[in-house]
């Protein structure tokens, strides 16, 4: 592949000058260029993150087909770092689809939270981009209603909010227009001045326009002096074929290192704490295998239905929406072997090994459900098919339970049960680890015939009210020998006073810093889809009808039979939580 080198136009070192200006006369090239000596031997390169936001100077590299391979792809391979102050670099964050709900409710508030905590670099700007016609002031008014300061830190809240909004701008354009992205590039350069510019694009848009946006941004609005990164929201296709095609299309314009596939569940506090709990506590790591763990449950439930999102949801269903990504990613993180280090690639390598070791899903190990209408006194709840955006007679599941198995030495024979559903009796997301019975239990007379009541259980509650608790057996005070099941409880809001950052805050900061540990690599994505695609095709070809369950119930009865088939009792239905 032939390459051409373009010198950084915003260098401060002497050697050459340039009179280049914007068409309004504003200079966008500094007067001087940087010339670095040619070396035939490799230098001592510095990779990763030198500090929270390490400024960089380097060349821009183009492939022989004319597409830019600048940014992370060069930065992370062999890019010499120079001693620049924080004032010499800037980060420009462009939210594509800024008028949508995700941008207004999650992305922009998360950016403000990072700014409030002084986690963003000194020089940054935020641009909203969408087809909606808005002015800068209209964007600021729109997002100001969704910005909040930390509950536990309200100092200078109004002033901080005002300063953040002053850095927010808007550009209206079509998603497939190179000219519109060239205009965005012009506006970005005006704000960036002569600093080394790093650019982050967040694609908060439907997946069918990902490639158009990436093409236009890569060709017309990528950085010529710093890195360029793109955050891609799920869904990443509907099956293995469409996902692979999306990846191939994106890689025409980006390298794998520039693509940050986000799964916001991996940014949740308790998911991050999972590895800490296991690998830094001797009491848990020796137990983390088939020898002591009887089953593991990954549970996601919502107490509301699709409520206006039925048109989108009906195209994907609960398996694609929750199980194939959120729950499967957590399963891989839970079950992986000890990585060589905490480096992103080492962790993701181990996750891929887990996914590739999983047994193909069987139809008899899957239960489907769909919520139906239900009346509770004076209040009535609609059925899924009552949603006007849902096609008549839809058999798209709003609930699913599945039993999965990992065919390796550590987990052979241990059922990993997933359960996800809408319009259930409670809102909950948790991991439940049920341990084996005590061999020859001396106190089995006290438990009667149901020895499941005597098993220990470790629970990591992701939402709501983050908590970790361990269920143990203990003696009730008194003269007799009466046993009771108790919880050793770590409730986060009671232990830690500070407000827990939102998952989007952590993931946005990681993307800015170039930390990929919580983002999904392309081979991870392929392995996840390879597991679920045959099942999804079989369900669609056979038109398997879901079992109906009342809105606000505990789900279809079939889920209980599935658990019983594998000698498991759902932990969230035991009634003692």
From Swiss-Prot:
Q: Which Pfam families match?
A: G6PD_C, G6PD_N
Could you tell me which InterPro entries the record lists for this protein?
G6P_DH (IPR001282), G6P_DH_AS (IPR019796), G6P_DH_C (IPR022675), G6P_DH_NAD-bd (IPR022674), NAD(P)-bd_dom_sf (IPR036291)
Recorded consequence of changing residue 149 to S: Abolishes redox regulation
Query: In what pathway does it function?
Result: Carbohydrate degradation; pentose phosphate pathway; D-ribulose 5-phosphate from D-glucose 6-phosphate (oxidative stage): step 1/3
Q: Which residues of the sequence carry a binding annotation for NADP(+) 1? A: 97-104, 131, 234
Q: Under what name is this protein listed?
A: Glucose-6-phosphate 1-dehydrogenase, chloroplastic
Q: Where is this region: Disordered?
A: 1-20
Query: For this UniProt entry, what is the primary localization, expressed as one broad class?
Result: plastid
Q: Which domain of life is it from?
A: Eukaryota
Can you cite a GO biological process for this protein?
pentose-phosphate shunt, oxidative branch
Q: Which cell locations does it reside in?
A: Plastid, Chloroplast
Q: How does it assemble?
A: Homodimer.
Task: Give residues annotated as binding NADP(+) 2.
Answer: 419, 428, 432, 461, 469-471, 554
Give the enzyme class: oxidoreductase
């Amino acid at each position: 592949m032939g390459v051409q080198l373009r010198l950084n136009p915003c260098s401060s070192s002497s050697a050459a000058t340039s009179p280049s200006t914007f068409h309004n006369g504003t200079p966008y090239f500094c007067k001087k260029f940087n010339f670095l000596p040619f070396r035939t031997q490799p230098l001592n390169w510095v990779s990763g993150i030198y500090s929270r936001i390490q400024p960089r100077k380097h060349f821009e590299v183009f492939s022989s087909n004319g597409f830019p391979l600048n940014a992370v792809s060069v930065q992370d391979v062999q890019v010499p770092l120079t001693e620049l102050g924080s004032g010499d670099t800037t980060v420009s964050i462009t939210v594509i689809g800024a008028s949508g709900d995700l941008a207004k409710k999650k992305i922009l508030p998360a950016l403000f939270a990072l700014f409030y905590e002084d986690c963003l670099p000194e020089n940054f700007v935020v641009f909203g981009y969408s087809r909606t016609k808005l002015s800068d002031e209209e964007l600021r008014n729109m997002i100001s209603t969704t910005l909040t300061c930390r509950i536990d830190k309200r100092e200078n809240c109004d002033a901080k909010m005002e300063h953040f909004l002053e850095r927010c701008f808007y550009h209206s354009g079509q998603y497939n227009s190179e000219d519109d992205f060239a205009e965005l590039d012009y506006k970005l350069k005006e704000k960036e001045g002569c600093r080394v510019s790093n650019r982050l694009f967040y694609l908060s848009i439907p997946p069918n326009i990902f490639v158009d946006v990436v093409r236009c941004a890569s060709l017309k609005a990528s950085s010529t002096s710093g890195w360029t990164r793109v955050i891609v929201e799920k869904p990443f296709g509907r099956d293995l074929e469409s996902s692979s095609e999306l990846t191939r299309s994106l890689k025409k314009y980006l390298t794998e290192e520039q693509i940050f596939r986000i799964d916001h569940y991996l940014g949740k506090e308790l998911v991050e704490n999972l590895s800490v709990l296991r690998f830094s506590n001797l009491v848990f790591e020796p137990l983390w295998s088939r020898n002591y763990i009887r089953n593991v449950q990954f549970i996601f439930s919502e107490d509301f239905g699709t409520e206006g999102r039925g048109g989108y949801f009906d195209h994907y269903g609960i398996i694609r929406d929750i199980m194939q990504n959120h729950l499967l990613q957590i399963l891989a993180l839970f079950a992986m072997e000890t990585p060589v280090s905490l480096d992103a690639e080492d962790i993701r390598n181990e996750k891929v090994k887990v996914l590739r070791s999983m047994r193909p899903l069987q139809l008899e190990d899957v239960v489907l459900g769909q919520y139906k209408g239900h009346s509770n006194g004076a209040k009535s709840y609609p059925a899924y098919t009552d949603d006007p955006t849902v096609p008549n007679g839809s058999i798209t599941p709003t609930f699913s339970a599945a039993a999965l198995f990992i065919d390796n030495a550590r987990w052979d024979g241990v059922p990993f049960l997933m359960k996800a559903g809408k319009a259930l009796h409670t809102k909950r997301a948790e991991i439940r680890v049920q341990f084996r019975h005590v061999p020859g239990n001396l106190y089995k007379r006290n438990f009667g015939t149901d020895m499941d009541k005597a098993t220990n259980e470790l629970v990591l509650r992701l939402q709501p009210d983050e908590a970790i608790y361990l269920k143990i057996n203990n003696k009730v005070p008194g003269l007799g020998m009466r046993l009771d099941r108790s919880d050793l409880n770590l409730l986060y809001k009671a232990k830690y006073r500070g407000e827990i950052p939102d998952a989007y805050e952590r993931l946005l900061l990681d993307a800015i810093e170039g930390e990929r540990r919580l983002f999904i690599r392309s081979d991870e994505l392929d392995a996840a889809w390879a597991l679920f695609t045959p099942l999804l095709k079989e369900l669609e070809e056979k038109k398997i009808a879901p079992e109906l369950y009342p809105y606000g119930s505990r789900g279809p009865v079939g889920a209980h039979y599935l658990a019983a088939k594998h000698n498991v009792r759902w932990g969230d239905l035991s009634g003692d939580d």
